[in-house]
Swiss-Prot record:
Stored Gene3D superfamilies: 3.30.420.40
Source organism: Yersinia pestis
Localization per Swiss-Prot or TrEMBL: Cytoplasm
GO biological process: tRNA threonylcarbamoyladenosine modification
Class of enzymatic activity (EC top level): transferase
Pfam entry (one): TsaD
Gene: tsaD
Lineage start: Bacteria, Pseudomonadati, Pseudomonadota, Gammaproteobacteria, Enterobacterales
Name used for this protein in its record: tRNA N6-adenosine threonylcarbamoyltransferase
Length: 337
């Protein structure tokens, strides 16, 4: 079975072809970072228009990369939510139209389920059950996963997501959009311990997160200490350490609560090397394992959508002919497989 995956939920156009026997056959990605950089964030209308321009050419490029034609595709999977409604509609409309024209099923995919299943693309794929830490620009969640579609939300951010806090703090430090990865690189030059940031909501029971206060703490620290290069690097280091420690503390609690031995980290922030090393060390001490996708599959991409679509299609969970998207869509509402 060969599935074409289409990802257009935000500011990346991702197209991929996944074969259930041969694995990933093609992966094409176009990032709109330069388009939105001057605005300091994603402009929804510009994102939608750029997806209109790029999606079909990338589909053609993916088919060429895989040395396939339309007749070789058995299904089309597309991101149906959550995300920006205009951007989602571009991918959904094109995906649905191609499926109709080619006479194959169309499968709407939950964007965060795509992220959650992305580590399954690796050779060392996790087995169920596991705790999933989903960390991106729009979501920070801890989820108990006992099977496909068997998702129990354990905790989530009550305000800013971790990735959003990274980007906002990076902007305070004078870094360009998207600043999260730049902040992490700056943090590598920082002095450990010069500044100490709080670990929000770790002094009380529960698995929810809060990161908006760290941004305010960073702003106050910058004002009080100046913004020379070394001070900025030291602040970046303190901020990143605070976020990583908070994620690790909450993940440990989730593992204790569930009794699971496996931890999956997914989403754009899961590419952060400091976070990976921290969680790997934690899981080694616990006698467990941590799983994550390669960096190119941590950020938005078509490969995770193609794979998730294939999993859903195996259970005949394709949808009707109408085009519909869900900008807000809880993972808990997905059907079990």
């Amino acid at each position: 079975m060969r599935v074409l995956g289409i990802e257009t939920s935000c500011d990346e156009t991702g197209i991929a072809v996944y074969d259930d026997k041969a694995g990933l056959l093609a992966n094409q990605l176009y990032s709109q970072v330069k388009l939105h950089a001057d605005y300091g964030g994603v402009v929804p209308e510009l994102a939608s228009r750029d997806h209109v321009r790029k999606t079909v050419p990338l589909i053609q490029a993916a088919l060429k990369e895989a040395n396939l034609s339309a007749k070789d595709i058995d299904a089309v999977a597309y991101t149906a939510g959550p995300g920006l409604v205009g951007a989602l509609l571009v991918g959904a409309t094109i995906g649905r139209a191609l499926a109709f024209a080619w006479g194959v099923p169309a499968v709407p995919v939950h964007h965060m389920e795509g992220h959650l299943l992305a580590p399954m693309l690796e050779e060392n794929a996790p087995e169920f059950p596991f705790v999933a830490l989903l960390v991106s620009g729009g979501h920070t969640q801890l989820i108990s996963v006992t099977g496909i579609g068997e998702y129990l939300l354990l905790g989530e951010s009550v305000d800013d997501a971790a990735g959003e806090a990274f980007d906002k703090t990076a902007k305070l430090l004078g870094l360009d959009y998207p600043g999260g990865p730049m902040l992490s690189r700056m943090a590598q030059q920082g002095t450990v311990g010069r500044f100490t940031f709080p670990r929000p909501m770790t002094d009380r029971p529960g698995l929810d997160f809060s990161f908006s206060g760290l941004k305010t703490f960073a702003a106050n620290t910058i004002r009080a200490n100046g913004d020379d290069d070394q001070t900025r690097a030291d602040i970046a280091r303190a901020f990143e350490d605070a976020v990583v420690d908070t994620l690790a503390i909450k993940s440990k609690r989730a593992l204790d609560q569930t009794g699971f031995k496996r931890l999956v980290i997914a989403g754009g922030v899961s590419a952060n090397q400091t976070l990976r090393l921290k969680l790997a060390d934690m899981m080694q001490k616990r006698g467990g394992e941590v799983f994550y996708a390669r960096p190119e599959f941590c950020t938005d991409n078509g490969a995770m959508i193609a794979y998730a679509g294939m999993v859903r299609l195996r259970s005949n969970l394709n949808s009707e002919l109408s085009v519909s998207v869900r900008p807000r869509w809880p993972l808990s509402e997905l059907p079990k497989v």
